[in-house]
UniProtKB/Swiss-Prot annotation:
This is Small ribosomal subunit protein eS1. Residues 1-18 have a biased composition (Basic residues). Pfam families: Ribosomal_S3Ae. It comes from Paracoccidioides brasiliensis (strain Pb18). One of its GO terms (biological process) is translation. GO terms for cellular component: cytosolic small ribosomal subunit. Component of the small ribosomal subunit. Mature ribosomes consist of a small (40S) and a large (60S) subunit. The 40S subunit contains about 33 different proteins and 1 molecule of RNA (18S). The 60S subunit contains about 49 different proteins and 3 molecules of RNA (25S, 5.8S and 5S). Its main location: cytoplasm. The modification N-acetylalanine is found at residue 2. Belongs to the eukaryotic ribosomal protein eS1 family. Coiled coil: none annotated.
Length: 255
C-alpha cells in the first residue's frame, strides 16, 4: 500500500496566529505650508512612513507635489478654475515648506471657453525670472464682437492673429523677465491677461485672455535662506504668531 498524505487529517491553520497591523500606525502626519505670497498658508496634511533605520521621513517628503485650487489659497471663489502645483523643498519640524511648481486650468473651464464663431489665439513663451527660475507660460485669448457689430462671426485675419501673438509674447517677456518667481505668481492670475487685452484692443478686441498654464522647466540651486524668506523668515506655525499680535492689540485697547 502506498504511503501518502491523509487529506482528512485536520491541520493547524498558520494564518490564525498572525495579527494584522494597521498600516497607519507606522505613519506620521505633517502639515503642508504654502508660501506667504498666498492668503491662506495651510494647504492640508500629508502622511509619510516614520523614520526607521536608514529610511528618513524627510527624504520621502522632499519633492512631493501637491495640486491645490487657487480659490482655497486666496480665499476667493473667482479663482476656482485655477490649479496651483506646490513642491515640498524643505521639512522643518512637522511642517513641509513648499514652493511654486506650476499652474494649470481645470479641463471644464477650458472646454467652456472654446466656442463657435470666434478665433482662438494661443502663444507660449519661455522666460527666466530674476531669481533664475526657467518658466514656460502658455497664454490663451479669444476674439469678441466689436461695438454695434451686426455680423455673427468674429474671425480675425491671419495677419491680425500674428500681430496679436507678437504682442502677447512681448508683454509676457516684459512682465515675467523683470520679476522674481514670488512676484510673478501674484501677476499670473489676472494682471498679465488684462495687459494683453488692453494692448491688443486696436488690432482686434479680445475676451477671456488668460495665462492658462505655467510650467517650471528649471530651478536654481536650492537656497534655504530664500525659501525661509518666502515663508515669512520663520519655520514655526503661523497660529502662534497670530495669537501674539492679537494679544498685543487687546493690551493697547485696555490701556
Amino acid at each position: 500500500m502506498a504511503v501518502g498524505k491523509n487529506k482528512r487529517l485536520s491541520k493547524g491553520k498558520k494564518g490564525l496566529k498572525k495579527r494584522t497591523q494597521d498600516p497607519f500606525s507606522r505613519k506620521d502626519e505633517y502639515s503642508v505650508k504654502a508660501p506667504s505670497t498666498f492668503a491662506i498658508r495651510d494647504v492640508g496634511k500629508t502622511l509619510v512612513n516614520r523614520t526607521t533605520g536608514l529610511k528618513n521621513a524627510n527624504d520621502a517628503l522632499k519633492g512631493r507635489i501637491f495640486e491645490v485650487s487657487l480659490a482655497d489659497l486666496q480665499n476667493d471663489e473667482d479663482h476656482a478654475f485655477r490649479k496651483v502645483k506646490l513642491r515640498v523643498d524643505e521639512v522643518q519640524g512637522k511642517n513641509c515648506l513648499t514652493n511654486f511648481h506650476g499652474l494649470d486650468f481645470t479641463s471644464d473651464k477650458l472646454r467652456s471657453l472654446v466656442r463657435k464663431w470666434q478665433t482662438l489665439i494661443e502663444a507660449n513663451v519661455t522666460v527666466k525670472t530674476t531669481d533664475d527660475y526657467l518658466l514656460r507660460l502658455f497664454a490663451i485669448a479669444f476674439t469678441k464682437r466689436r461695438p454695434n457689430q451686426i455680423k455673427k462671426t468674429t474671425y480675425a485675419q491671419s495677419s491680425q492673429i500674428r500681430a496679436i501673438r507678437k504682442k502677447m509674447v512681448e508683454i509676457i517677456q516684459r512682465e515675467a523677465g523683470t520679476r522674481s518667481l514670488a512676484q510673478l505668481t501674484k501677476l499670473i492670475p489676472e494682471v498679465i491677461g488684462r495687459e494683453i487685452e488692453k494692448a491688443t484692443h486696436g488690432i482686434y478686441p479680445l475676451q477671456n485672455v488668460h495665462i492658462r498654464k505655467v510650467k517650471l522647466l528649471k530651478s536654481p540651486k536650492f537656497d534655504l535662506g530664500a525659501l525661509l524668506a518666502l515663508h515669512g523668515e520663520s519655520s514655526t506655525d503661523d497660529k502662534g504668531q497670530k495669537v501674539e499680535r492679537e494679544f498685543k492689540e487687546t493690551v493697547l485697547e485696555s490701556v
